[in-house]
Amino acid sequence: MSDVIALAKDLIRRPSVTPQDEGCQTLMSERLARLGFVIEPMVFEDTTNLWARRGSEGPLFCFAGHTDVVPAGPLEKWHTPPFEPTIQDGVLYGRGAADMKGSLAAMVVAVERFVAEHPDHKGSIAFLITSDEEGPFINGTVRVIDTLEARNEKIRWCIVGEPSSTHVVGDVVKNGRRGSITGDLLVRGVQGHVAYPHLADNPIHKAAPALTELAATVWDEGNAYFPPTSFQIANIQAGTGASNVIPGELQVQFNFRFSTQLTDMDIRERVQALLDKHGLDYELTWTLSGQPFLTDTGALLEATVAAVAAVNGQQPALLTTGGTSDGRFIAPTGAEVIELGPVNATIHKVNECVKAEDLDLLAEMYQGVLERLLA
């Protein structure tokens, strides 16, 4: 069993469902401390974070990731217990195998090997690890970044270990992510009896044309790196449950995944103008989960593409698809940020798994990036 697989299994054994860490960061810290890393736990409320750094000079290279996992779901649907890592036919099963304890293991072992070969490497290496990525993302990476910014500790390059790959490890590198903003809309009407509609005001009927227009709007055309901005209605609630009552209000929740062609303020203003045009009596609150970011050039992207190609024999595709990641908190500081991790086909599913060999290859890729930037 390789060092990478052994560490991955040790991490998976710990049932660290958000926001719990269950000792994962301590396990990582012990190994990093032996390499000369200064270990700095950062605990905010219910969230455990780790900032570990080797070296004091720039440029600063950072591995970022999370030790928390989503709940296992129905245990009877798992082939093997989710927190008892098992290898069958070369495949490692367990909650977090792909998202993202496998990446964490590959990162640590890659750094161990790199430091053994280059004890006096250039710059500094750091780990930014949180137990709050799968949850509300309030006390995790964003709080660590705030702390680093307050003391002017700047990350130059960052690899986030999210499972970026589609079919083969390293076939996709995420060099950016779309922004995400959610709107919670309350449309007011007047409740009444369905047989006396003239005495009521149906908020569903009033809002339907506006919602139809929102769904039909072309918000932008995207660009070379991002698909067009998308609008999706996620939840609609109204009524008492009775078939003879016109509801007094309608609640609608919708989400935008937006490209760099728009700002969140553009979206807010356009939505409000549309709702006003339809004469609705409404309240609208917004939750911005993250701005879009893009690393389209730079030393990190060049080193990552070269390192992946050296292992796989072909260059990765550069994509910005998928959901948000903690990269959205790191990129605004000016850092170059990319995501590279295992195949994501089973993340958040029962029987989450990853080819064991892929984690060894991932460690080679991570080490290859370090070689090209800091050796």
Swiss-Prot record:
Belongs to the peptidase M20A family. DapE subfamily. Binds 2 Zn(2+) or Co(2+) ions per subunit. The keyword Zinc applies. Pathway: Amino-acid biosynthesis; L-lysine biosynthesis via DAP pathway; LL-2,6-diaminopimelate from (S)-tetrahydrodipicolinate (succinylase route): step 3/3. Gene3D superfamilies: Zn peptidases. Zn(2+) 1 binds at residues 66, 99, 162. Keywords: Amino-acid biosynthesis, Cobalt, Diaminopimelate biosynthesis, Hydrolase, Lysine biosynthesis, Metal-binding, Zinc. InterPro entries: ArgE/DapE_CS, Bact_exopeptidase_dim_dom, DapE_proteobac, Peptidase_M20, Peptidase_M20_dimer, Peptidase_M20A. This is Succinyl-diaminopimelate desuccinylase. It catalyses: N-succinyl-(2S,6S)-2,6-diaminopimelate + H2O = (2S,6S)-2,6-diaminopimelate + succinate. One of its GO terms (biological process) is L-arginine biosynthetic process. Its cofactor is Zn(2+); Co(2+). Zn(2+) 2 binds at residues 99, 134, 348. PANTHER family: ACETYLORNITHINE DEACETYLASE, N-ACETYL-L-CITRULLINE DEACETYLASE. HAMAP family: DapE. Catalyzes the hydrolysis of N-succinyl-L,L-diaminopimelic acid (SDAP), forming succinate and LL-2,6-diaminopimelate (DAP), an intermediate involved in the bacterial biosynthesis of lysine and meso-diaminopimelic acid, an essential component of bacterial cell walls. GO terms for molecular function: acetylornithine deacetylase activity; cobalt ion binding; succinyl-diaminopimelate desuccinylase activity; zinc ion binding. It comes from Aeromonas salmonicida (strain A449). It comes from the Bacteria.
